[in-house]
Amino acid sequence: MIHEIKMNEIYCMDNLELLKKMKSNSVDLIYCDILYNTGRKFKDYDDRLGTPQEAIEWYRPRLIEMKRILRSTGNVVLHCDYHINSYIRVAMDEIFGIKNFRNEIVWKRSNDTGSSKAKGNKLPVCSDTLVWYSATDKYTFIMPTIPYDSKLMNRFKYDDNDGKGKYYWADLRTYSEKRLNELRDNNELKVRSSGKYSYKRYLNTANTNKALSNIWDDINRLSSNSSESCDYFSQKPKALLQRITNMLSNEGDVVADFFMGSGTSIVVAKELGRQYIGCDINPRAVEITNKRLNDIKIGG
């Protein structure tokens, strides 16, 4: 019997029992790749929770406990798909509050939509949903960015070999007399035939990253021959969890996953300098996660 929940530990037990034993206001980020209630039994877990109403009643006490243990600056991300995301949203609105809903993130996990000749009566599904809520309006959030595409980067095609690096001619829409004189003195200004100004925009001074939207299409699902693969059904890629962890927590924070599976969220938490608590009812999941944790070489 577990009497005290310790940090940086993995537990093999019913997640509701673990949640009930945890202290209030003790976790900064909860990420759970929950059961989608597909009605199927997979190699590593049973995904049959009954009707949608029965599934939500199974989830309700767990969501209530998640709300209790979350710190005021904390976040929770529930990873699901079309089978249950709408029901989860309604339950989360009720428990966490509509005002604490932050985003519904669409993860396009695959570009493979199957053969165009395949017969079907609906569109193929190639995405999952990340439902994100915070505990309050004072939540941790670090805006993630990604590089602009090659089309923009290819614009930096000029180089005067003067040590300033690559640049392109950008429109100068607003300017002062002082700014014009500085550009002219540095040979960074030209007047177009229209009479409008252009200036040299250098790559090393340009913001080459853009803010990420709620559509994540740059991270693919794991292939069976990936070096990350643990042969665990529905294992998620580390890149996805790295983005979530960096976006919604700080170094030293506590990350918890109560539907741990192969343990990717826990492995990433350790690698990124977070504390962690992991839980799964499947002994194989616990075994795989512990092995992955033991294989981590911090700073190596």
Predicted regions, residues:
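Core catalytic lobe of class I
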Residues: 1-290, 294-298
